[in-house]
Amino acid sequence: FPLKDAFDALSWLASQQTYPQFYWQQRNGDEEAVVLGAITRFTSLDQAQRFLRQHPEHADLRIWGLNAFDPSQGNLLLPRLEWRRCGGKATLRLTLFSESSLQHDAIQAKEFIATLVSIKPLPGLHLTTTREQHWPDKTGWTQLIELATKTIAEGELDKVVLARATDLHFASPVNAAAMMAASRRLNLNCYHFYMAFDGENAFLGSSPERLWRRRDKALRTEALAGTVANNPDDKQAQQL
């Protein structure tokens, strides 16, 4: 069906009270998806791909979710409801699946539909930081830089990408979907992904690069270590 310009899939997803919730937007913005609910879950790519191979009659069926560096710790799902946009056209898919009774799953799907609510605007982000901690700290970070430059100077490496983790605490709960929306506005030309496991736990990010893409036996990767937008204030950017 044709899209209305005012429709924001992420806002609609965040308005629902069913979990898990998953959002994804392709880097150039041509493809976008939201999925809601899980009929069945998979902990690895192998499990998910095996399931898809068992249902070749549904070539457009997709499994969504998150991979992990540990192949057995993924969080992949066959969604109850999938909205997918390609260009200016969108499709809405409600999936029924059961290993024992499709009739019973149809009843559950009907109950699921009854829980859906209208779209609500996402709230703005007004956060007050109460604690900020970096790993490594400034001393450790300086040591890493010195080690990296020394290693490059000695010819052992041509390039190295340093990274650190930051733990932020706020005075009030963070609306993860609103943070995803803010990142989407700021970090252009990125892959945006968001998964809410429940009302209090979510995983999200905006990456300018794709580590890899595999289609059948073809594996494609690209040069990594790009950048995303930094704070416009030079002092804040320096601190970050």
Where are these regions (language model features)?
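Secondary-structure boundary elements
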Residues: 142-143, 147-158, 185-187, 197-199, ...
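Short, surface-exposed beta-strand/loop "edge" segments at domain boundaries and coil↔beta transitions
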Residues: 28-37, 74-75, 98-106, 201-204, ...
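SIR2/sirtuin-family catalytic core signature
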Residues: 171-219
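Short Lys/Arg-enriched alpha/beta "domain-start" segment
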Residues: 1-55, 167-170
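A short, Trp-centered hydrophobic/proline-enriched beta-strand micro-motif
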Residues: 18-26, 62-64, 158-160, 190-195
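Short, flexible loop/turn elements at secondary-structure junctions
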Residues: 67-68, 166, 197-199, 210, ...
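Cytosolic ligand/metal-binding cores
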Residues: 87-116, 206, 211-240
